[in-house]
């Protein structure tokens, strides 16, 4: 099987809703105002604990506090559909979301204040089933109960349609069980409400589910089906995965559905702060990885991707100072 060559990806190897978002935004605003007299305070809006992005935000917050002298608050929200406009409005200083979610949010809501910091790491994902079942491929999901809807992560449905398309399936071919976000979908899976859930590799929740149900399996995606998938979502690709503690559920070398995870801010954040954020995470990668193994894929060059969202001037200066050119999609 020929997978896209990803030298950076090998670094991964290791030896409801709206109301909740607004409440979180209010709490964050109070925190930021109370800290105005302090040195520097940043709020990082992310998803709920147990998600890949929450762990990533926690790692970044720790490094920024310990290495860059910044006071940082990690602010969980219901999902990426909340995080992006929250950050654009300046109610959070930094946000983390996948590239598709960012593209759609900007296209639909005209978030003119949103500014990109960079692509922090690839986002490898999968449909997971119980290891005790005979289900092994995406085609086996036909007629099964599968998480769907994702009202707080609206673009996940687009990704799921792309993955189903690799085996000639559509959402109509599965029994859809509506959930607000991936964490709730995993909880429903544990409770027996669905046959398959969708999540990113490296998230603590995946490890938790694996231990709770006695083992899970990542469903295989046929490379031949990627042409059909790209008609749904052009930026998705298969990246190599092998059995190891990061890729829980991978039983043999296979390709896993992947795209980029982005770090972004807004136009009101000072240039020197954004510059300091990038400089700190690049220089202290080893510290980040102790908390979030997915950040093994982080590189200064990898941050600077081509995207429809404009870069923050602080990021532009960092890339210019370090002679880092822009690259195309992975």
Protein language model regions, located:
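N-terminal secretory signal peptides that target proteins for export/translocation
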Residues: 1-16
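Sec/Tat signal peptide C-region and signal peptidase I cleavage site
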Residues: 33-39
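Bilobed "Venus flytrap"/periplasmic-binding protein-like clamshell domains
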Residues: 40-67, 72-73, 123-191, 285, ...
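Extracytoplasmic
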Residues: 69, 79-82, 89, 112, ...
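Acidic, polar ligand-binding/catalytic clefts
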Residues: 88, 92-122, 204-207
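Pocket-lining segment of extracytoplasmic ligand-binding domains
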Residues: 98-101, 108-109, 133, 170-177, ...
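Ligand-binding clefts/hinges and TM-proximal coupling segments of bilobed small-molecule sensing domains
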Residues: 151-162, 237-307
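An extracytoplasmic/periplasmic, membrane-proximal ligand-sensing/linker region
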Residues: 183-184, 191-192, 200-218, 223, ...
């Amino acid at each position: 099987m020929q997978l896209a060559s990803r030298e950076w990806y090998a670094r991964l190897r290791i030896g409801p809703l709206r109301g909740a978002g607004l409440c979180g935004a209010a709490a964050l605003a109070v925190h930021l105002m109370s800290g105005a007299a302090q040195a520097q305070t940043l709020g990082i809006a992310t998803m709920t604990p147990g998600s890949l992005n929450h762990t990533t935000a926690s790692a970044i917050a720790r490094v920024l506090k310990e290495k860059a002298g910044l006071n940082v608050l990690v602010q969980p929200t219901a999902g990426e559909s909340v995080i992006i406009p929250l950050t654009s409005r300046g109610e959070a200083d930094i946000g983390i979301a996948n590239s598709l979610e960012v593209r759609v949010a900007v296209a639909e809501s005209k978030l003119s204040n949103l500014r990109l910091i960079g692509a922090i790491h690839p986002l490898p994902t999968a449909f997971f089933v119980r290891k005790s079942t005979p289900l092994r491929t995406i085609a086996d999901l036909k007629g099964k109960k599968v998480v769907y809807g994702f009202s707080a992560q609206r673009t996940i449905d687009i990704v799921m349609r792309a993955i189903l398309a690799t085996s000639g399936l559509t959402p109509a071919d599965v029994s859809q069980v509506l959930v607000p976000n991936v964490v709730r979908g995993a909880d429903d899976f544990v409770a027996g409400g669905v046959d398959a859930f969708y999540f990113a590799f490296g998230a603590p929740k995946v490890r938790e589910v694996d231990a709770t149900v006695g083992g899970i399996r990542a469903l295989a995606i046929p490379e031949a089906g990627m042409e059909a998938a790209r008609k749904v979502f052009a930026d998705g690709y298969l990246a190599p995965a092998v059995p190891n503690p990061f890729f829980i559920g991978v039983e043999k070398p296979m390709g896993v559905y992947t795209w980029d995870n982005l770090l972004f801010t807004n136009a009101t954040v000072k240039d020197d702060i954004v510059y300091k954020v990038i400089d700190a995470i690049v220089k202290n990668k080893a510290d980040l990885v102790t908390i979030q193994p997915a950040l093994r894929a982080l590189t200064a060059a990898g941050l600077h991707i081509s995207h429809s969202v404009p870069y923050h001037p602080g990021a532009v200066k960092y890339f210019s100072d370090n002679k880092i050119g822009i690259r195309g999609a992975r």
